[in-house]
Amino acid sequence: MSDIVASFSSISAVNIRPHFTDSAWSEYQKIVAEGNPTLARTPSWTFAELDSLVICREMPIKLNFKGNKKFVEDVVFRVNKKTKKIESLAYKLSQNTEKHIMAKEWNERDRLTLITFLEDYRTAYCLRDIEYINKVFSNDAYIIVGKVLQQSKKKYNDNTELINQDGKVVYTQYSKEEYLVNLKKSFMSKEFVNIRFEECNVGKGYNAKEGIYAVQVRQLYYSNNYSDDGILTLAIDMRNDVNPLVRVRVWQQERDVEYTAEQMIERTVSTEGSISSN
C-alpha cells in the first residue's frame, strides 16, 4: 500500500498499475479523477479478511471542488490474498454505520459482506457510476424517490410569484428504467455528489429468506445544486453475494414504521425474490 500512498502524497516515479486488477484500476481512475484528490493525513491501516480478500482500511483523501467545497473520503482497498493485487476499492462508511453493523450478532462474514456492499453502493452514487447502479438494481425493483422542492421565483411583468413551496416533498414511484433515466440526467447536472449514511438500522432474513438483508439509514445528500436529508431504506438480495441485487429502494423525509428494516424483509421481498406491492 505504501506505493499507492506515495502516489498521492508526492510526485512518485513508482508505477502503481501492476498493483491493480483491470477492474480495480478502472475504479481507481474514477476516484483519482474526482475533486483533484490529495492525501489528507498519514493512513492508519486496519485489516480484516473476507473470503479470498484482505480488506485494508483506510487511506484518507481530500477532495476539492469549486466554491471552496471540500470533503475527506476514506478509501478502502480489497486485496486478493494470493495474487496480492487490489481487486476493488470504495469509499468507507461512516464510523457510526460501520460500528452498528459490526455490533450485530451475525457471523463476521455476513457483517463484512453487507458493509462491503454498502461501501460500493455509496461510492457509486458519489462517483455518479450509472453502470454499477444499473447492474445492482433488479429489473423489477420497487423504487420510491422523494424530492425536496426548493423555493423558486418566476417574474410576470413586475410581479414575483413563488412557484414551489419551500421544503415540500414529492414522492414518486419509478420503474428501474425510469429511475436510471432520471438519475443519469441528475448526475450530468452535478459537479459532485456527496452522500453520507448515519443512524443505521439493519436486519437479515432467516430460514427461507436467508441472504435477504434490509438496511435503513439516514442519508445526507449534498451536491452543487441540490441537497436533502432523509431516510433511505434498501432491501438487498445477497443470496448470490457475488452479484447482489437491490430489490427495494425507498426514500422518505421522515422515518416511517411501514418501512423498518425488519418489516421490509417480511412485507416486500418474497422467498422467491419477487416484489409485493402491498
Report residues per predicted region.
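Short beta-strand edge/turn micro-motifs at domain boundaries
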Residues: K66-D110, Y206-A214, Y222-N278
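Conserved small-residue-rich
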Residues: D110-T172
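A compositionally biased, intrinsically disordered/low-complexity signal enriched
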Residues: M1, F8, I16, F20, ...
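Short, well-ordered alpha-helical segments enriched in acidic and aromatic residues
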Residues: M1-V32, R128-Y156
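Loop/turn elements at helix/coil->beta-strand transitions in domains of secreted/extracellular proteins
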Residues: R128-E131, V193, V242-N243
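Surface-exposed, charged secondary-structure patches
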Residues: A24-K81, N157-D228
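A mature extracytoplasmic/lumenal domain signature
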Residues: I61, A90-L93, F137-D140, K147-V148, ...
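Short, low-complexity N-terminal intrinsically disordered segments enriched in polar/charged residues
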Residues: M1-S10, T83-L127, K135
